[in-house]
C-alpha cells in the first residue's frame, strides 16, 4: 500500500545543493564517481553483514554496480545489489547532513569558486552531487533481508523538499535514476560514461558494468569466414580487484590518486602515499595517504578520523581511529589485516594486541614517509608543514616512544634568517650551535614580530647565538612536553637565568659580578618601591639596548601558558614576575640619580609596566599606565 509523504530538506542540505550546483559546475562529471563509490560501499557493507547472515544474499552473491542510459528519456541509471536502505534510512541519509561541524563548514566558504569547490569536495557531497547534472532524481531501494513489499522510492527536484513512498521492489539494493538537465544530455551517452568510469572507477573492487549490445551474424563470403551472432551482455568496465592487493609495480600514479579520491572524497590529488605489504609475524597490507590540503574541520573535536579497516579483503569499518594516533589524524587510507577476526568490533579493537602492533607499525611508516619527504624535497615538505604542522606539534605530548622522531620533523622560524617562514629544524639548529653551547635557546610570543623583536634576545644576538622563534598557540603546550633534543636541553630566554655557561668568558663574568655589586643599592630601592608587584629585582644578564624586562622564575608559568589557560577559562595561580634592570641604560642610570622618592617610584613603575607591555602585549590596567605616562610628560613640560 502506498504511503507517500513529503518532507522538507534540512536547511544545510538546501545550502549545500545550491552551493554545489554553482561551485562544482566545472567538475560536474564527479557525480558518477561519487555515485559509483557509494554503490561500491553498499556492496562492501552487504559482504560484511553476510558473514554472519548468509541469507542476506538472497541467492545472489555476485555483487556488482550497473550503469545504463536512455537517450530518448535523457536519463542515467546507477544500480547496485548491495545492502540497500529502509524507509527510515532513506529519510535520514537523503534528507539531512549527519555531520558534526556543518555550521563551521558554511562559515568557511569564501565565495571564491575554486576555493569553495575544494572545501565542498573535502566535506563530501556524495549522493547530492546528482543534482549537478539532474533536475530530478528518483531513488528506488530495498534493504537486504526485507520483503519485496518494503521497497522505498525517494524523489526530488533538488529544491525545497522530497517525497518518500513505499513500493514493491523484487531485487535488493539501490537504483538511482538521474533525469538529466537539458544542457547535460551529453551524459546520456554510453561512450561518455565509459570514459568517466575508466578514469575514476578502475580501482573499485566490485565490477562496474555497462550493457554491451550483441552483434548480428555475418554470412561467409569468399573473403572471410562466417561469424556467429552474439548476445548482448553486461560487461565490466573496470579491473574489479582491490587496488591494494595488487603489486605496487602494477598500479599507476593515476590509479593511486583516484583511489585516494574514492576513499577520502577529496577533489585534490594527495601529497604522497605509501603502499606496503608485510608478511611474517604479522600479515597486513597498508595504503597510507597524506593529503595536500588540510580538511576544513581538522580542529573539530567530534570529527571522525582513522583508516578504513579490511580483514582478509573484506570491508569491516570506516574511521578506525585505533590504528592512528590523534596527531596523525590527517592521514587517509586503509589497513587490511589477516590477523584480526572478521567479526571484529570497535570495542575489540580498543584493547587488542594485534591492533597495538598495527598502530605501532603504521605510525612508524607515516613518520618514515615524512622524514623521507623532508630529506628529499624540502619545498614539498613545506607544503605539508603549512597544512599540518600544528597538528604534528601535538605529537611529543601524545607519543613518548616516537618523541625524538617527531621533534626532528618540526619546523620553526629562527634568528638565523630574517624570514618568518618556519623552515628551521632542530637538527639544523644543533648543526649551527657555537663551540661551548649546550642548550637550544627559544622564545614563545604572540606573533613572529613580537618574538623576533623581543628585548630578551639582545645579548644572544650580540653574541651571534641563534634563537628559535615560536609564535603559534600550540607552541607553549609543545614546549612543556619537548624539553630536549639530541641530548641538548631546550631553554627559554624569558625564564630564569640565560645560563650561557661556556659561551660567557671570564672577563664577561667578572664585569657582570662587578655591575651587580655596584647596583645593589639601586636594586633594593626599586624593590622597596615596587613592593608586591614583583617577586624580585635583579641586574639583567640578557639586555644590551633596553632598560628593563620581566622574566618568569624557574618553575613558574610563562606568560604564554597563562594566556592559554585564561582563554580556556581555567583558574590561573597568581604569579609575580622577576624584574630585570639594565644599569648601563641611560634611563636606569638617570633613575639611579633621582633623589625625589615620589618621582623614583613613578619611574620604577613606568619601567615595570613598559617591560610587562613588551612581554605580554597588554596590561591589566592600561588606563592607569596612560595616566602615569601623562603625569610624567606634564611634569617634564613644566
From Swiss-Prot:
Residues 564-638 are annotated as: C. CDD domains: HATPase_Hsp90-like (cd16927). Residues 1-346 are annotated as: A. Residues 347-563 are annotated as: B. It comes from the Bacteria. Keywords: ATP-binding, Chaperone, Cytoplasm, Nucleotide-binding, Stress response. InterPro entries: HATPase_C_sf (IPR036890), Heat_shock_protein_90_CS (IPR019805), HSP90_C (IPR037196), Hsp90_fam (IPR001404), Hsp90_N (IPR020575), Ribosomal_Su5_D2-typ_SF (IPR020568). One of its GO terms (cellular component) is cytoplasm. One of its GO terms (molecular function) is ATP binding. It is found in: Cytoplasm. Belongs to the heat shock protein 90 family. HAMAP family: HSP90. Molecular chaperone. Has ATPase activity. Homodimer. This is Chaperone protein HtpG.
Amino acid at each position: 500500500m502506498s504511503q507517500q509523504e513529503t518532507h522538507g530538506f534540512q536547511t544545510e542540505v538546501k545550502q549545500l545543493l545550491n552551493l554545489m550546483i554553482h561551485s562544482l559546475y566545472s567538475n560536474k562529471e564527479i557525480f558518477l564517481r561519487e555515485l559509483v563509490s557509494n554503490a561500491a560501499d553498499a556492496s562492501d557493507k552487504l559482504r560484511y553483514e553476510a558473514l554472519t547472515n548468509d541469507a542476506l544474499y538472497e541467492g545472489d552473491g555476485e555483487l556488482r554496480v550497473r550503469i545504463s542510459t536512455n537517450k530518448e528519456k535523457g536519463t542515467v541509471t546507477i544500480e547496485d545489489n548491495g545492502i540497500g536502505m529502509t524507509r527510515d534510512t532513506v529519510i535520514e541519509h537523503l534528507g539531512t547532513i549527519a555531520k558534526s561541524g556543518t555550521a563551521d563548514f558554511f562559515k568557511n566558504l569564501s565565495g571564491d569558486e575554486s576555493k569553495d569547490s575544494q572545501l565542498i569536495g573535502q566535506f563530501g557531497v556524495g549522493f547530492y552531487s546528482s543534482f549537478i547534472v539532474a533536475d530530478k532524481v528518483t531513488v528506488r531501494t530495498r534493504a537486504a533481508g526485507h520483503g519485496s513489499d518494503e521497497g522505498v522510492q525517494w524523489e526530488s527536484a533538488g529544491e525545497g523538499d522530497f517525497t518518500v513512498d513505499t513500493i514493491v521492489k523484487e531485487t535488493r539494493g539501490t537504483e538511482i535514476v538521474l533525469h538529466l538537465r537539458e544542457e547535460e544530455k551529453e551524459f546520456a551517452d554510453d561512450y561518455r560514461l565509459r570514459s568517466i568510469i575508466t578514469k575514476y572507477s578502475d580501482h573499485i573492487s566490485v565490477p562496474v558494468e555497462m550493457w554491451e549490445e550483441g552483434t548480428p551474424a555475418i554470412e561467409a563470403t569468399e573473403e572471410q569466414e562466417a561469424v556467429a551472432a552474439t548476445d548482448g551482455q553486461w560487461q565490466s568496465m573496470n579491473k574489479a580487484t582491490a587496488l591494494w592487493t595488487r603489486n605496487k609495480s602494477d598500479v599507476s600514479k593515476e590509479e593511486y590518486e583516484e583511489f585516494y579520491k574514492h576513499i577520502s572524497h577529496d577533489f585534490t590529488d594527495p601529497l604522497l602515499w605509501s603502499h606496503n605489504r608485510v608478511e611474517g609475524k604479522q600479515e597486513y597490507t597498508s595504503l597510507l595517504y597524506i593529503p595536500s590540503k588540510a580538511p576544513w574541520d581538522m580542529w573539530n573535536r567530534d570529527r571522525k578520523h582513522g583508516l578504513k579497516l579490511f580483514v582478509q579483503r573484506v570491508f569491516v569499518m570506516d574511521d578506525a581511529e585505533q590504528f592512528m594516533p590523534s596527531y596523525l589524524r590527517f592521514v587517509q587510507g586503509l589497513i587490511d589485516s589477516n590477523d584480526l577476526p572478521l567479526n571484529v568490533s570497535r570495542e575489540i579493537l580498543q584493547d587488542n594486541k594485534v591492533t597495538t602492533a598495527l598502530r605501532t607499525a603504521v605510525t612508524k611508516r607515516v613518520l618514515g614517509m615524512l622524514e623521507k619527504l623532508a630529506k628529499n624535497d624540502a619545498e614539498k615538505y613545506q607544503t605539508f608543514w603549512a597544512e599540518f604542522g600544528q597538528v604534528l606539534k601535538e605529537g611529543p605530548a601524545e607519543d613518548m616512544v616516537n618523541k625524538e622522531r617527531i621533534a626532528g620533523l618540526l619546523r620553526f622560524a629562527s634568528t638565523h634568517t630574517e624570514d618568518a617562514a618556519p623552515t628551521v629544524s632542530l637538527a639544523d639548529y644543533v648543526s649551527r650551535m657555537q663551540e661551548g653551547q649546550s642548550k637550544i635557546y627559544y622564545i614563545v610570543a604572540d606573533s613572529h614580530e613580537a618574538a623576533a623583536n623581543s628585548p630578551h634576545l639582545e645579548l644572544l644576538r650580540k653574541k651571534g647565538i641563534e634563537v628559535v622563534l615560536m609564535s603559534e598557540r600550540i607552541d607553549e603546550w609543545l614546549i612543556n612536553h619537548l624539553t630536549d633534543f639530541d641530548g641538548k636541553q631546550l631553554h627559554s630566554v624569558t625564564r630564569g637565568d640565560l645560563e650561557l655557561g661556556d659561551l660567557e668568558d671570564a672577563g664577561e663574568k667578572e664585569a657582570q659580578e662587578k655591575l651587580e655589586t655596584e647596583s645593589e643599592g639601586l636594586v633594593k630601592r626599586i624593590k622597596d618601591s615596587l613592593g608586591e608587584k614583583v617577586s624580585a629585582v635583579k641586574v639583567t644578564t640578557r639586555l644590551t639596548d633596553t632598560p628593563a624586562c620581566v622574566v618568569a622564575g624557574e618553575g613558574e608559568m610563562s606568560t604564554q601558558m597563562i594566556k592559554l589557560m585564561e582563554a580556556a577559562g581555567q583558574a590561573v595561580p597568581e604569579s609575580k614576575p622577576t624584574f630585570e634592570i639594565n644599569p648601563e641604560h641611560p634611563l636606569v642610570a638617570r633613575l639611579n640619580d633621582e633623589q625625589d622618592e615620589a618621582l623614583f617610584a613613578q619611574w620604577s613603575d613606568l619601567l615595570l609596566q613598559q617591560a610587562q607591555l613588551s612581554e605580554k602585549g597588554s596590561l591589566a590596567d592600561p588606563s592607569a599606565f596612560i595616566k602615569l605616562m601623562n603625569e610624567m610628560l606634564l611634569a617634564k613640560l613644566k
